[in-house]
Each structure stands twice: as structure tokens, then as C-alpha cells.
Amino acid sequence: MMAKKSVKKPARRSVTFKLEDAPGRQVFVAGCFSDWQPKHRLTDREGRGVYTVRVLLAPGEYQYKFVVDGEWRLDSANPNFVPNDFGTLNSLLRVTADK
């Protein structure tokens, strides 16, 4: 009988998405990590106009956008972006395995 080899998955890391210029009632982040569904809602916990949410992601590259009241927008604080299949741009996030 052969011994089973266990494949260790890289640990997921907590990533904070932050959007400061979002005068909207519903603020979400969507990307390849959520099948482009706006599942992760950002909240303004302190009432200062700074919306945040934490998402657990494995190391890798992720394309994403913010969705503010149904309008898709780039992350203006992130200078990294790539073209998408719709002729617009997506923000690009690199999550490393470093601690």
C-alpha cells in the first residue's frame, strides 16, 4: 500500500480592501476571488467616509474592482491595473506568502 502524500495548501492571508472616496450607500469589492460577484461589502465603521472589508486570500494575483451603488470602479489608491476583456481596466492585487 502506498502512503498518501499530503499536499499543503498555502495559508490564506487577511487582505484589507479600503475605499475612501465612495459617497454611496452600498459599497462592495468584487473580483476573480469571488467570481466577480459583489459578495464582500465594505462598511464605514467610524463614519469618516473610509470604507473597509477584510477578505482571506491565498497567495497569488487577483483582479478586482469596487462596486459603488451598482457602478464599477477601479481602486484609485492602487497604481497596479491590467486590461480586461471588456476594454476597460481592473485593479491588480498581489498577495505574497511572506509573513
Regions found by a protein language model. Name each.
Residues 9-61, 71-98:
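Aromatic-rich carbohydrate-binding modules that target alpha-glucans
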